[in-house]
Amino acid sequence: MRTTPTFPTKTFKPTAMALAVATTLSACLGGGGGGTSAPDFNAGGTGIGSNSRATTAKSAAVSYAGIKNEMCKDRSMLCAGRDDVAVTDRDAKINAPPPNLHTGDFPNPNDAYKNLINLKPAIEAGYTGRGVEVGIVDTGESVGSISFPELYGRKEHGYNENYKNYTAYMRKEAPEDGGGKDIEASFDDEAVIETEAKPTDIRHVKEIGHIDLVSHIIGGRSVDGRPAGGIAPDATLHIMNTNDETKNEMMVAAIRNAWVKLGERGVRIVNNSFGTTSRAGTADLFQIANSEEQYRQALLDYSGGDKTDEGIRLMQQSDYGNLSYHIRNKNMLFIFSTGNDAQAQPNTYALLPFYEKDAQKGIITVAGVDRSGEKFKREMYGEPGTEPLEYGSNHCGITAMWCLSAPYEASVRFTRTNPIQIAGTSFSAPIVTGTAALLLQKYPWMSNDNLRTTLLTTAQDIGAVGVDSKFGWGLLDAGKAMNGPASFPFGDFTADTKGTSDIAYSFRNDISGTGGLIKKGGSQLQLHGNNTYTGKTIIEGGSLVLYGNNKSDMRVETKGALIYNGAASGGSLNSDGIVYLADTDQSGANETVHIKGSLQLDGKGTLYTRLGKLLKVDGTAIIGGKLYMSARGKGAGYLNSTGRRVPFLSAAKIGQDYSFFTNIETDGGLLASLDSVEKTAGSEGDTLSYYVRRGNAARTASAAAHSAPAGLKHAVEQGGSNLENLMVELDASESSATPETVETAAADRTDMPGIRPYGATFRAAAAVQHANAADGVRIFNSLAATVYADSTAAHADMQGRRLKAVSDGLDHNGTGLRVIAQTQQDGGTWEQGGVEGKMRGSTQTVGIAAKTGENTTAAATLGMGRSTWSENSANAKTDSISLFAGIRHDAGDIGYLKGLFSYGRYKNSISRSTGADEHAEGSVNGTLMQLGALGGVNVPFAATGDLTVEGGLRYDLLKQDAFAEKGSALGWSGNSLTEGTLVGLAGLKLSQPLSDKAVLFATAGVERDLNGRDYTVTGGFTGATAATGKTGARNMPHTRLVAGLGADVEFGNGWNGLARYSYAGSKQYGNHSGRVGVGYRF
């Protein structure tokens, strides 16, 4: 296939459709061709040298005035059943509005062409073409493009009938040592060249050819942050160089072999920036009869009419047949440029669908527009004394139905070059090819038909309104294309979403057209738009989700599922599969699914719905199969103990009795009881309703406690009791049995005063009623608010540890006045019946100790502390400030008496989950006073040590203020609390001097609460006005073992220090404490 005319250019003489433009120069090549000379890496400016211009005249455009309006008759493959198809003289007289050029998306002028195609949304969504195989069938002397870092790692193959012409190619090798040497390529088959070189090793690359420029537009990387990267920089490129080196032009057999090899390698998208040029003008293909043979002959005539012409050889050698085979059997999409002859018709390759109807699904023709986005690029060239020649993009012409437009001008940049400005439809086509790669990355299951439908129907309409003969479907819109098709104009759109049910794909455009949707495959497809396409929707496999309105009538096969999400609507529905009514969100708003036609649920299918959802049918409903009714979710509202009817299906007429459901299953949630289905008839039609009521929360919680961990049983039962008390109050309120409870509560209506205090309470209680029964233990436990009692008990125990530290200090003070500063760190775990709570604390104290008499020592300290407590889904933070004091009186060597005192204020801040899905926060203030009296007897131990037996009592008095949580109607409103606890203390103390400056200590003992501790808080839920209850609490171990080790050291000059470790715990509870301090003795 030889290009006419030829040009004296050194780089290439292809039929490739390009105009390569340097910074200040333009090169226009005839026959749709174009090129650049080799870049001079030592030159300034763009690095591009001389360019050539064509001097051969072009054929005049042929008028289409004779085409009749009935041109679409019997040619549905062209007109796709549309009456508004705009081609040739049927172009609309009204122009579309100017396109949105998105001029600010890519501010760098070298990326300006990306603005025209709205590429930014695709890039921001993370699509780069990764995993997509793209073929490039092209030409050009430069076979070193893969050596550029922008194209590094790509594959390049050459095809030629005369393989020996390739044996002279020399490539650079990139061994591990980083060196390089010239090697001669060896070729045993048609895969002539397949090499890789280091990204920085480009010294042997001397030319940038057409093949390099096209490859860069599709998949060039932006190196070192420079702009002008390609559309799909992570796509895998299979670069097919079809050049005949002896003639420096493309070979017909090489093109055909390239397509074959790409098909064998599984490549799905192929860029073809070349074509043949029409010399006989634009033949009127619509004037002939409809037989295939006459189409074939017309196509041959269109390609030139000369029996020796390369265009006829193309047909004789079945290149069109080869192309058609790969479209039909290899699912490949071929993208062609229209050419640069400023003609009204594109090159002949684009005409295949006239001769092979099915080929339309695998071919896209691309015209080029200027930077305005709505005009063709036109330029005049000519030598002095000759007639000027016009160059620029060919129109879509009679290929309009499979044609769109893309920028004619672009910019690329290779390493060691300045940006190269290029122009021509050779670069319009790869812009579309790169976008197709992004689309296939997002929707890897899309067929060639899916891809071309999506790319065409999402284009911005430019020129004459509708599909027109100049711009086809309009200007490529990559951002919109990434949201799926916008129309089904070519018949049914088959979405075979291969994969598993946990994978979901979304179409977010509004979809129109006369075609339908056939959903296959296991994955989910979501339709988010308001769709008006009129063909049928058939779900053969996987699930289809409707988020908006859908005009189409629908059919669900046995392996399919239709999900109406929220208040979606659709046409008539016939189902043998699954129909599922889902919630848009968790707001609890009642939503109606509207079927604008009839409903037929066959015996093999299942209707999944929930209370509060209404399936409204305008026509007749024939119901059968299985019904699965769930009371989960908030939409059913609050249920009282009496019960009420909740409608779930209404129709103009229900054609079969509701008992025709062969199987009914229900999920009542935690507290909802679904008793029976009732059918009622009214003036507006028939209705099916469920009669529902609530269960008893206390009994449900008691049953749930049997399966709860032992440590939660009491709290679960207490939470159920609290909730039942609340719901008895709600049942008695004025509107508790009203079907519009949730809506009325939300509105807080003044004409129903009984509901005003309960608005949020009804909603919170309803959420618990309709929660998952499996969450019962967690929910009931949260309604007991045990964190208040548990964190208070942990704080009281920690203050007791701090008071014991003061007591121990009295035993080892020595003479004189001593000032001491200490820090104490505590950590503990409380395990009870498989449930765990954790405590962490830190206290800083300063104090004094002194001899106040010959046998008397007194001490006082001020401490500030913070502790945290965590359990289940609740956390507490306690801040405190406390005063500690003690006095010891020695009775000679026999023993001693001690008096201890502490008084502290604390603030306990709580954050926790409550109910089904709510969160509450609160804070409570309190005081803790401790009084202790101890006596000790000294027992001689070894030669220098002392053993002391100590015992006594301590009284803890806790007073806590009333409080109310915020954030939830199921938060706790607690009464004030006063609790006194008597604690028995007994232990042993051993001291052993190591020298006159160091003493070791060891302690062991036991503590026992003589009357137990009960820090539970009476009160009620914040959303109640009368119902009462109390919080739960863990069982604080009555008996706790204590032990400790420590040392005191005199540093000299009055300075001294101490270190202590202590433990207090039981089988369920353990607290570890570490304390260090430094003091000065006056």
Curated annotation (Swiss-Prot):
Any one GO cellular component localisation term in the record: plasma membrane
GO molecular function: serine-type endopeptidase activity
Comment on protein domains: The signal peptide, cleaved at the inner membrane, guides the autotransporter protein to the periplasmic space. Insertion of the C-terminal translocator domain in the outer membrane forms a hydrophilic pore for the translocation of the passenger domain to the bacterial cell surface, with subsequent lipid-anchoring to the cell outer membrane and eventual release of the passenger domain. The translocator domain forms a 12-stranded beta-barrel with a 10 X 12.5 Angstrom channel.
Positions of S-diacylglycerol cysteine lipidation: C28
Entry PTM: Probably auto-processes to yield a 68-70 kDa form and a C-terminal 30 kDa translocator domain; upon overexpression in situ and in E.coli full-length protein is seen as well as (probably) auto-processed forms of 68-70 kDa and 30 kDa in size, suggesting this may have protease activity.
Family to which the UniProt record says this protein belongs: Belongs to the peptidase S8 family.
SMART domains tied to this protein: Autotransporter
Lipidation positions, renumbered (N-palmitoyl cysteine): C28
BP terms from Gene Ontology: protein processing
Phenotype when the gene is knocked out: No longer processes NHBA. Bacteria are more susceptible to killing in human serum and human whole blood, human complement factor C3 is no longer cleaved, increased C3b deposition on bacteria.
PANTHER family xrefs: NEUROENDOCRINE CONVERTASE 1, PROPROTEIN CONVERTASE SUBTILISIN/KEXIN-RELATED
EC number: 3.4.21.-
Protein's name in the database: Neisserial autotransporter lipoprotein NalP
Keyword set, alphabetical order: Autocatalytic cleavage, Cell outer membrane, Host cytoplasm, Hydrolase, Lipoprotein, Membrane, Palmitate, Protease, Secreted, Serine protease, Signal, Virulence
Signal peptide coordinates: 1-27
A Pfam match: Peptidase_S8
Domain Autotransporter, first and last residues per copy: 808-1082
Active site: D138, H210, S426
UniProt function note: Major human immunogenic protein, detected in patients recovering from meningitidis. Autotransporter with a secreted protease domain involved in processing other autotransporter proteins including App, IgA, LbpB and NHBA. Probably autoprocesses to release the about 70 kDa passenger domain. Both cell surface protein (Neisserial autotransporter lipoprotein NalP) and the passenger domain cleave human (host) complement factor C3, generating a shorter alpha chain and a longer beta chain than normal.
Cross-referenced InterPro entries: Autotransporte_beta, Autotransporte_beta_dom_sf, Autotrns_rpt, Peptidase_S8/S53_dom, Peptidase_S8/S53_dom_sf, Peptidase_S8_Ser-AS, Peptidase_S8_subtilisin-rel, Peptidases_S8_Autotransporter
